[in-house]
Amino acid sequence: MNNFRATILFWAVAAWVTSGKPLGEMDEVGVQKCKNALKLPVLEVLPGGGWDNLRNVDMGRVMELTYSNCRTTEDGQYIIPDEIFTIPQKQSNLEMNSEILESWANYQSSTSYSINTELSLFSKVNGKFSTEFQRMKTLQLKDQAITTRVQVRNLIYTVKINPALELNWSFRKELLDISDRLENNQTRMATYLAELLVLNYGTHVITSVDAGAALIQEDHIRASFLQDSQSSRSAVTASAGLAFQNTVNFKFEENYTSQNVLTKSYLSNRTNSRVQSIGGVPFYPGITLQAWQQGITNHLVAIDRSGLPLHFFINPNMLPDLPGPLVKKVSKTVETAVKRYYTFNTYPGCTDLNSPNFNFQANTDDGSCEGKMTNFSFGGVYQECTQLSGNRDVLLCQKLEQKNPLTGDFSCPSGYSPVRLLSQIHEEGYNHLECHRKCTLLVFCKTVCEDVFQVAKAEFRAFWCVASSQVPENSGLLFGGLFSSKSINPMTNAQSCPAGYFPLSLFENLKVCVSQDYELGSRFAVPFGGFFSCTVGNPLVDPAISRDLGVPSLKKCPGGFSQHLALISDGCQVSYCVKSGLFTGGSLPPARLPPFTRPPLMSQAATNTVIVTNSENARSWIKDSQTHQWRLGEPIELRRAMNDIHGDGGGLSGGAAAGVTLGVTTILAVVITLAIYGTRKFKKKAYQAIEERQSLVPGTAATGDTTYQEQGQSPA
């Protein structure tokens, strides 16, 4: 009997472990099972993963892939997941081409061309933060060169995803966390989690992959070679092709003298060259094209990708356990997070290399190449602060307030007008000892103290001063750059101000370097063109129109000025403008990665949503109070839930019921106290009555005692 029980327990535990194992682990078991059974390699070039379309980087897996059926490609060469299908090329598709890329603006990726060219609001910056793009742009501008690219591409399979597949367990869990925050009205935390989702899974989902290999040579040759050469563009591409053939041994039997003459001038003007073997065997000098092709079979990689935006896959079909309206809110929140990622990595500026206003860091042209710079006077900055909550010992405004050195107060000097740049709430957590009296039955009381965590809040309002009329020369402040805790001052290449300048504090951690010394400070002075933020434009763009018509200012820089990031303050981008050509040297900046929103120090009060109704199809979802899972509600359940929320008219509301309960408890306590007091009083009165009666008849008691004694002695 004991053996039977042990067997049952063993299989129960085994079943629980199997059912409780994450899908990712189940997938690994399936892969190994198929490899052992079929003795075939697994196709590693698979769609269904996340993709960062700014950096051209593969991200976390979005779609779930399983190997329960041990499927293979049509040619039986590779094991593939159940959720994908392949389109094999019946014959080897070997392609060789040469091209000239005169400008970085029309550069196309070798391995992600299709997904980079998808049309969207921010498609102009797709791939602009990839390693290959930044390398090419830097070399073109540094060497004043153009780029030639020769490549041999061998396509083996096109791998596509099945539209009916499911979301990966980890990705789905993060979506459920976002939905839980949204349904409980914790919007700020939901935004923060959505930005973390973009950080982990990218901006798109790969739906199709071209599997194969590519051998690529990129040369950078002086731009003057193409301009001064009597040869045509086709002759230059032919020279690039011949240079590639010299690198990769094509084993041509004939070698013409004209080929040597044609390539000699090309090679003498080459400033940089790189050969990449993407897939196949590693490249080495002298490798033959035949040897490289023969090594492709077991070394397939993705040589092109197609995909759709991440939020496209957040729909009711993918999340059937959630109410449709809630799924739409999750999708919109993720879409907004992706757009914010694109926005904070868009660098407007002049992209014309021949313009004096050229901005090396700009990745989108804003039409500023033709503008002429105007000298503007800078009236300083200041910041006001109001404490909203917190202990007396937690004074937030002491480090948030900043007076204008030109006035010594929170104001602008004469002839200048204040521009409110941004208003935000600053939060800081603190602990303090909180004591209160705790009583039982209103009689037994004691003092209870506990360490309580609370959040102090203060509102700060940042202003800068713009000239509203003609001001005297040298009346404002000199601008010497700025820096924050996460950025350096381009004037000093450090988190500091130039000599003769002092910092003014703005926002929570921005330092603006200014000087009032026009003799010593002019050496490091930078022509300043104003501030603007996500909420307020720059009045210097067209001051006459803004002042006369009262229309909102444009969020851009005046002509002759270039835009630069000051900081991202809790999801809001603040930019400043300096003379074009300054602060644009050095290397290209890396991508600014999310999250950009600061998570709340304490969770907001939850609204505990229990019913979601879809107005489009009149369907309602109810959240189970025990399992916290959503399900479609029946009419009877809906009426019962509505009665629980709003009351049925015959009962008491939650507050009324609490009041009645408290009242009854108090009355009972009073009654019990009075009863105890009355009982004690009654007993005391009874004792007093007996004593009085005894004092009135003392003789009776004495006679009785004597008689008793006599009776006791008479027999003697």
Curated annotation (Swiss-Prot):
Keywords of the record: Adaptive immunity, Cytoplasmic vesicle, Disulfide bond, Glycoprotein, Immunity, Innate immunity, Membrane, Signal, Transmembrane, Transmembrane beta strand, Transmembrane helix, Ubl conjugation
Biased composition (Polar residues): 703-716
Keyword Signal on entry: yes
Membrane-spanning segments: 113-120, 127-132, 235-244, 248-256, 656-676
Matching PROSITE patterns: MACPF_2
Topology relative to the membrane: Multi-pass membrane protein
Record-level GO cellular component terms: cytoplasmic vesicle; phagocytic vesicle; phagocytic vesicle membrane; phagolysosome membrane
Entry's Gene Ontology molecular function annotations: wide pore channel activity
S-S pairs: C34-C70, C350-C369, C385-C397, C435-C449, C439-C445, C534-C572, C557-C577
Occurrences of domain MACPF (ranges): 30-345
Subcellular compartments: Cytoplasmic vesicle membrane
InterPro entries according to UniProt: MACPF, MPEG1
Signal peptide (residue range): 1-20
Taxonomy, superkingdom: Eukaryota
Region described as Disordered: spans on this chain: 693-716
Primary location group: membrane
Similarity section: Belongs to the MPEG1 family.
Subunit record text: Homooligomer; predominantly forms a homooligomeric arc-shaped pore complex instead of complete rings of 16 subunits.
Name used for this protein in its record: Macrophage-expressed gene 1 protein
Organism lineage string: Eukaryota, Metazoa, Chordata, Craniata, Vertebrata
Gene that encodes it: MPEG1
